[in-house]
Amino acid sequence: MLSCHELVLDSAANRVTARGQPINLRGVEYRLLEFFMSHSGRTFNRHQLLDHVWGDDSEVDERTVDVNVQRLRRILAESGHQEYIQTVRGYGYRFSAPNVARAE
């Protein structure tokens, strides 16, 4: 389980909640959020995100990362957490949330 403030990702249940309310994510959005939360504060370029989230052998282009990050931002904005995913101009993206906690 990963949490920051009131955003909780429960990997055992494949569920994300914000302020106790469920957030509906598609598979890739869930994996992207899980990866970002697991590596909070680190910056990743599109190619790295493709490798880690979609897999080394995926045949999607880097624009797919942008589309899915925007979609995830929009979903998180509905619960007041859009500021966590930051664009690092000329490089990629970073999940920047204070105190991401990991619990079993």
Please place each PLM-identified region on the residue numbering:
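A short linear beta-strand->loop->alpha-helix hinge motif most characteristic
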Residues: H81-E104
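Basic, amphipathic DNA-recognition helix from helix-turn-helix-like DNA-binding domains
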Residues: M1-S3, A103-E104
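Generic detector of short alpha-helix boundary/capping microenvironments
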Residues: L2, V8, E78-G80
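Residues that cap or initiate secondary-structure elements
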Residues: V8, P22, N99-A101
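Positively charged, aromatic-enriched patches within helix-turn-helix-type DNA-binding elements
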Residues: A13-R15, G20-N68, R74-E83, R89
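Conserved catalytic Walker-motif region of ABC-type ATPase nucleotide-binding domains
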Residues: C4, L9-S11, F95-A97
